[in-house]
Amino acid sequence: MPLGTLGAHGARNRYLEAILVTATSTLRVIQEAQVPLDRDIFLRSLLRELAGTLEDVVGLKDAAGYISVVGQRIGDQINNEYRSALQTPVLSREQVAEVLVDLKRRIQGDFYVVTQDEDKIVFRNRACPFGGMVSNRPSMCMMTSNVFGAIAAENLGYAKVELQETIAQGAAECMVVVHLKQTPQSEAVTGREYFQNWHK
């Protein structure tokens, strides 16, 4: 092979090697970039934008209704999982309260029971599972309402979930009251009602 040809091949190889090194270096820089993105953040962002779009297009009330359907189904699934894990066909009131706290803990919420009796369970929450994504997206609170309502009603017969305070609307903590009986007090508050087996 002529020397000129060898020189051309050598130059071409060095050029390709330089491109490869540059591409590898660029890829490393991109992979190590401090971009606040992972699967959890992506999914929470997706839910936030979906909720926001629904609120803008159909209004807050209807958006909450659509999200309620999703929350109801998730609530049923979670209820079945806990019943199976605890090997019981039905949860007691105390178990319902602990299950609701535990399920929120598992998704990085920080709910705790303030008080409970035969009429209601009162919860507070210091951290929303959706994080900052829930800000100004009150329809996303329907996930909590429906999951809590579905589990409470399926095990105890009835529930009315009252969202007294929510982080979504600017409160420092959430306050959620799950009414377990239809009383004058529960009928006087704004909330969503849930009944055992109503959707089956």
State what each model feature region is.
Residues 2-122, 127-143, 153-200:
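N-terminal accessory segment detector
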